[in-house]
UniProtKB/Swiss-Prot annotation:
Listed name of the protein: Imidazole glycerol phosphate synthase subunit HisF
EC number(s) per entry: 4.3.2.10
Family: Belongs to the HisA/HisF family.
KW Lyase (keyword) present: yes
SUPFAM superfamilies, A to Z: Ribulose-phoshate binding barrel
CDD domains documented for this protein: HisF
Gene Ontology terms, MF aspect: imidazoleglycerol-phosphate synthase activity; lyase activity
Pfam families membership: His_biosynth (PF00977)
Catalytic activity annotation: 5-[(5-phospho-1-deoxy-D-ribulos-1-ylimino)methylamino]-1-(5-phospho-beta-D-ribosyl)imidazole-4-carboxamide + L-glutamine = D-erythro-1-(imidazol-4-yl)glycerol 3-phosphate + 5-amino-1-(5-phospho-beta-D-ribosyl)imidazole-4-carboxamide + L-glutamate + H(+)
Catalytic residues, chain numbering: 11, 130
Functional summary from the UniProt entry: IGPS catalyzes the conversion of PRFAR and glutamine to IGP, AICAR and glutamate. The HisF subunit catalyzes the cyclization activity that produces IGP and AICAR from PRFAR using the ammonia provided by the HisH subunit.
GO biological process assignments: L-histidine biosynthetic process
Gene it is expressed from: hisF
Length: 256
């Protein structure tokens, strides 16, 4: 069985790691290169580095930071934020990223997913979905773009199916309702999408306890769990999470 993954998320704004609640109220959480190194050494399986202001401020991701971070860490590394062209993807992969995450640009031009997958390989193309529960229609989640500021009107489950059909290798699924709250992942949303596509789904938004992480895997059927506040604030360590999940008989890579 393929090992389930724990992935610290580094949301970066103006060169610093930040963390907020429900996509707002950002506070400083440290230097991305230092934090990336720390999590790499602590036993994380991968890292995700998202330049959360890149799309909104119409600037490209800080390639230099990617280069410095990739030189410092020994685990696979995904980079997202403001990537809107094949050249942008190429630049980040050349700078040392293992994968790139597309979000607003994929909604605007879905062919970027298939073009990226054809040129660089599906394994390099992650598509991020920022989803929020529709208040009026049950079992429906809306897709948001531009750092959670704009409702596209797209249905998250239908969009996930299209992403899969276009050749993406992975989906990074963030519950905007859960983001930063530490009230648990949106298990229903995660399960619905995990069951609809046969590529890995990374659960994101809401981890606050060991059982939340276990639930993302067992009930949500995700392949990976994204972690931010929980780790940045020092509430739990990667080691503590892995030891717990191994005791719960989940297929986790032990820390050597």
């Amino acid at each position: 069985m393929v090992a389930l993954r724990l992935i610290p998320c580094l949301d970066v704004s103006n060169g610093r790691v930040v963390k907020g609640v429900n996509f707002v109220g950002l506070r400083d959480a440290g230097d991305p290169v230092e934090l990336g190194c720390r999590y790499s050494k602590a036993g994380a399986d991968e890292l995700v580095f998202l330049d959360i202001t890149a799309t909104h401020e119409k600037r490209s991701t800080l390639v230099d930071m990617v280069r410095r971070t990739s030189e410092a860490v020994t685990i696979p590394f995904t980079v997202g934020g403001g990537i809107s062209s094949l050249n942008g993807i190429n630049e980040l992969l050349r700078a040392g990223a293992d994968k790139v995450s597309l979000n607003s640009s994929a909604v605007k031009d879905p062919s970027l997913i298939s073009q990226g997958a054809n040129r660089f390989g599906s394994q390099c193309i992650v598509v991020a979905i920022d989803a929020k529960k529709n208040k009026h229609i049950p079992n429906k989640w809306d897709v948001y773009v531009s750092g959670g500021r704009k409702n596209t009107g797209l249905d998250a489950i239908e969009w996930a199916e299209k992403i899969f059909e276009m050749g993406a290798g992975e989906i990074l699924l963030t519950s905007m309702d859960g983001d930063g709250t530490q009230n648990g992942y949106d298990i229903e949303l995660t399960r619905c999408i995990s069951e609809k596509v046969s590529i890995p789904v990374i659960a994101s938004g809401g981890a606050g306890s060991l059982s939340h992480i276990k639930d993302a895997f067992t009930l949500g059927k995700s392949s990976a769990a994204l972690l931010a506040s929980l780790l940045h604030d020092g509430q739990l360590t990667i080691r503590e999470i892995k030891e717990y999940l191994i005791k719960e008989n989940l297929p986790i890579r032990p820390i050597e």
